[in-house]
Amino acid sequence: MLGSLSWEHMLVLVVVGLVVLGPERLPGAIRWTSNALRQARDYLSGVTTQLREDLGPEFDDLRVPLSELQKLRGMTPRAALTKHLLDGDDSFLTGAFDRPVNGAAAQPPPAPAPPPEPHRPGQTPFDADAT
């Protein structure tokens, strides 16, 4: 949760705390916050221990699907398609279909067809079946 909290962010939080709470109340607020976090951590570890005792070996069986869900959580739709439907081959999505195989020389793309001749001015063609 706080893994991306850098020293710069901590410094900004301390400065904001000094401005908002003042130097008299800031140490008490820090103490209260650290105690609340410690109590929450103790509560969560107690719940985990109790679940482990109640479920026994089934607890490990429960962890396997949860870890798979955690892996899927950060996947983008493109990564999910690539992994599950395309077996990791994303050439369908990137458009890199024709890669040279075994060092074969790549052929240059064909020259584009000349543009069609513009329509001659005059009466617009009429199609009785189309109307």
Curated annotation (Swiss-Prot):
Recorded GO MF terms: protein transmembrane transporter activity
Domain of life according to the entry: Bacteria
Subcellular location field: Cell membrane
InterPro entries: TatA/B/E, TatB
Biological-process GO terms, alphabetical: protein transport by the Tat complex
Pro residues bias locations: 107-116
Disordered, as annotated region: 96-131
Keywords associated with the record: Cell membrane, Membrane, Protein transport, Translocation, Transmembrane, Transmembrane helix, Transport
Membrane topology of this protein: Single-pass membrane protein
GO CC, one annotated term: TAT protein transport complex
Transmembrane segments: 2-22
Record family assignment: Belongs to the TatB family.
Protein role: Part of the twin-arginine translocation (Tat) system that transports large folded proteins containing a characteristic twin-arginine motif in their signal peptide across membranes. Together with TatC, TatB is part of a receptor directly interacting with Tat signal peptides. TatB may form an oligomeric binding site that transiently accommodates folded Tat precursor proteins before their translocation.
Subunit structure: The Tat system comprises two distinct complexes: a TatABC complex, containing multiple copies of TatA, TatB and TatC subunits, and a separate TatA complex, containing only TatA subunits. Substrates initially bind to the TatABC complex, which probably triggers association of the separate TatA complex to form the active translocon.
Annotated protein name in UniProt: Sec-independent protein translocase protein TatB
Species of origin: Mycobacterium avium (strain 104)
Name of the gene encoding the protein in the UniProt record: tatB
